[in-house]
């Protein structure tokens, strides 16, 4: 997991992706991305801001040279050293910036939500490991410890004749905010959204320790997943790999049953 080419570097506003993983959006971008060691991508809208090649920053557009967060991302790119000490604490966490203001914009009282659901704010990790690719051939980013456990669990399931697929892994606060904004635009009420999605900042996906799991031929993130051999196998074996079902029926958080949502939570990292 210490291969710098397989690590996503994360800051409050900008992500630094390894070169070769993002698709170019036009010929101009394609030429720059082709030789990039890193691509700096704005988290809020996914826009590519700049590339880094041989330690040199090159904005994709002149106006992007002063984009907020670019300097912070570049400092991380230049100074990053992967941690070699095992354990969840080996990956630094980002400060919870701007989140309360953006929750207010959605009409969510963070303190009230936390009190009602028992969910805590979840910081994003400073870096994530490439854990393969999801069902849609998108890079799957997970906390380094979860990535190792996921690989071991995939192999164990395959030996038993069960195919597990990742549907999604790490999601930033900005990504979760986008889910809410799009659903609100479609006319879905905030109360209804909160029954199926944790409020931005409160999702386990922010930690990189959680992922949605599927199996071939089964639609993603549907309750019908519980009727599959893959779910039966997870119920019997996931705990041995450190994974737990986060939202069973009747969970105390008020979130609908999600048989597909599993989080890496070995006893040693959960206080017992």
Say what each PLM segment does.
Residues 1-167, 182-272:
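Extracytoplasmic cell-surface/polysaccharide-interacting catalytic and binding patches
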């Amino acid at each position: 997991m210490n291969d710098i080419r397989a690590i996503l570097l994360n800051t409050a506003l900008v992500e630094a992706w390894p070169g070769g993983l993002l698709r170019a959006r036009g010929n101009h971008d394609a030429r720059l991305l082709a030789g990039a060691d890193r691509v700096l991508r704005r988290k809020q809208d996914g826009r590519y801001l700049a590339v880094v090649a041989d330690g040199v920053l090159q904005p994709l557009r002149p106006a992007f040279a002063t984009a907020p967060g670019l300097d912070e991302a570049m400092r991380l790119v230049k100074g990053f050293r992967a941690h070699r000490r095992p354990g969840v604490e080996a990956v630094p966490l980002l400060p919870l910036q701007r989140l309360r203001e953006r929750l207010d914009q959605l009409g969510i009282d963070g303190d009230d939500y936390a009190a009602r659901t028992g969910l805590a704010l979840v910081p994003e990790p400073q870096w994530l490991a490439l854990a393969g690719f999801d069902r849609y051939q998108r890079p799957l980013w997970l906390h380094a410890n979860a990535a190792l456990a996921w690989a071991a669990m995939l192999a164990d399931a395959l030996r038993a004749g069960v195919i597990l697929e990742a549907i999604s892994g790490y999601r930033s606060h900005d990504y979760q905010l986008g889910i809410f904004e799009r659903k609100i635009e479609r006319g879905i009420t905030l109360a209804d959204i909160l029954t199926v999605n944790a409020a931005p900042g409160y999702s386990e996906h922010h930690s990189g320790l959680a992922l949605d799991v599927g199996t071939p031929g089964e639609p993603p993130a549907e309750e019908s997943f519980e009727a599959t051999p893959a779910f039966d196998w997870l119920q019997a074996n996931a705990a041995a790999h450190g994974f737990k079902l986060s939202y069973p029926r009747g969970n105390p958080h008020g979130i609908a049953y999600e048989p597909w949502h599993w989080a890496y939570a070995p006893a040693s990292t959960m206080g017992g």
